[in-house]
């Protein structure tokens, strides 16, 4: 075969590299974007739920909880409202220095679906003087656990610490949080 000079080999190499990179980028554009959401054990049989905001939820806690309910209701396929049914309760009170700013708990029917739930904000850590937006992210986080979401990445409501998500710029449900809830219902 014909011998190529060193100069000819050097000129050919960048063309190979560019075509390989372009092929790689094209193939990567075909890969669907992965979702970061995960699931908790909670899964309601009915996608329409009512949360009862207990008397302890007042002032900025009430405003932020109502905003969280509205955000979930408008951004997802579920129907979420406030009312006086005792199936899902939300409370904000001083649970003391226990390490959590918010917590959700639920019990299950024999079928495995969620029977009832409670979402709690610990005012020991989440002070009434904090911004409503910060409280809203915490309510969104706890309500989303009850809708069936587990923890996710820091740029979502479902990051393991709602305050860290807030400090990272999260204010409302993100597209990942929305996809997670919608895929569940």
PLM regions with names:
Residues 32-185:
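Zinc-dependent metalloendopeptidases
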Residues 5-16, 40, 46, 60:
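Serine/threonine-rich low-complexity intrinsically disordered regions
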Residues 1-3:
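Short, Lys/Arg-enriched N-terminal segments with co-localized hydrophobic residues
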Residues 7-36:
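Sec-dependent N-terminal signal peptides of Gram-positive bacterial secreted proteins and lipoproteins
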């Amino acid at each position: 075969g014909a011998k190529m000079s060193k100069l000819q080999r050097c000129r050919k190499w960048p063309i190979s590299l560019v075509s390989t990179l372009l092929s790689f980028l094209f193939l990567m554009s075909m890969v669907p974007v992965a979702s970061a959401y995960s699931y908790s054990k909670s899964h309601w049989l009915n996608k329409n739920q009512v949360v009862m905001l207990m008397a302890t939820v007042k002032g900025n806690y009430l405003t932020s909880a109502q905003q969280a309910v509205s955000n979930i209701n408008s951004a997802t396929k579920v129907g979420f409202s406030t009312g006086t049914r005792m199936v899902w309760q939300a409370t904000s009170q001083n649970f003391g220095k226990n390490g959590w700013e918010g917590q959700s708990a639920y019990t299950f029917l024999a079928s495995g679906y969620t029977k009832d739930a409670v979402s709690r904000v610990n005012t020991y850590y989440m002070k009434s003087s904090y911004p409503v937006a910060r409280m809203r992210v915490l309510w969104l986080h706890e309500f989303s656990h009850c809708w069936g979401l587990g923890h996710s990445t820091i740029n979502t409501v479902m990051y393991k610490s709602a305050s860290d998500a807030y400090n990272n710029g999260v204010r409302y449900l993100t597209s990942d949080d929305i996809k997670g809830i919608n895929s569940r219902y």
